């Protein structure tokens, strides 16, 4: 019989760098239409916060049993604190570059009967200190076996080529999860 084995995720620390965001959900019942506009009124009964974007990638890596490290950009606010707490509870070592002048990106979904009624985005692209982010990443590369770049076009990976070159100089494989508009990674860039 053929013997299958799972990879040893616990022996491959992974560094995720990218656009972190908070996915916030408000759940409630709808029982009437608003008199102000033809929209349902939701009476919020519960809410939940989940790591989104690159933070969700790191969360999934940790769930597989790997040591997950995360570098990203947030505001200095309640949403960033919620993200940090959720990630810490899941075993993710999150290191945020916190910016005073901008809020953490939040995607708020209003749900009723397991149906999304509305999504509200609280975001503006981050104007990051790309050099400082690169220093943070380079200081962690000695601890990891894989670098994952998770780009949602929100500004954290403005200087992705520097990160790729630093990883390749250490023979660390780079995986890219580009969702942004301009993310040209080609194999010939070695």
Listing of model-derived features with the role each one plays in the protein:
Residues 35-42:
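Peri-catalytic substrate-binding/gating loops that frame the active-site cleft of hydrolases
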């Amino acid at each position: 019989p053929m013997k299958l084995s799972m990879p040893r995720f616990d022996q491959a620390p992974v560094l995720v760098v990218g656009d972190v965001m908070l996915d916030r959900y408000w759940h409630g019942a709808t029982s009437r239409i608003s008199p102000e506009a033809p929209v349902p009124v939701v009476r919020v009964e519960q809410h939940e916060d989940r790591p989104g974007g690159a933070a969700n990638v790191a969360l999934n890596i940790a769930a597989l049993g790997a040591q997950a490290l995360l570098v990203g950009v947030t505001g200095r606010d309640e949403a960033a604190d919620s993200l940090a707490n959720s990630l810490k509870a899941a075993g993710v070592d999150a290191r945020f570059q916190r910016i005073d002048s901008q809020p953490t990106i939040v995607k708020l979904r209003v749900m009723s009967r397991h149906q999304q009624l509305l999504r509200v985005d609280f975001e503006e692209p981050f104007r990051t200190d790309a050099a400082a982010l690169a220093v943070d990443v380079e200081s962690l590369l000695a601890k990891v076996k894989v670098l994952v770049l998770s780009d949602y076009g929100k500004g954290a990976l403005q200087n992705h080529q520097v990160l790729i070159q630093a990883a390749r100089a250490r023979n660390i494989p780079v995986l890219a999860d580009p969702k942004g508009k301009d993310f040209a990674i080609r194999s010939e860039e070695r």
